[in-house]
Amino acid sequence: MSKNTEKAIPVWEKYSLNVPEAAEYYGIGEKRLRQIANENEGADFILKVGSHIRFKRKMFEDYLNETNTI
């Protein structure tokens, strides 16, 4: 399938989000998301694909629900 005919998966159905997607979805800046990833290296909600950071959506939501300050 070409990109024009592919059906886009809604963000709320994706397993993981890249930094720009997560920033838009959660309303948190990209810089802060990268800091969170660096501060929580090895956390269950972080997925590293090569040098790229992805956030496991449901697990990151659980993390946010338990956090008082970002």
Predicted regions and their residues:
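Polyanion-binding surface elements
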Residues: 5-32
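Short, Lys/Arg-enriched charge-dense amphipathic segments
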Residues: 12-14, 67-70
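Residue-level recognition of hydrophobic positions within alpha-helical transmembrane segments
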Residues: 17, 57-58
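Major-groove DNA-recognition helix of helix-turn-helix-type DNA-binding domains
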Residues: 24-54, 61, 67-68
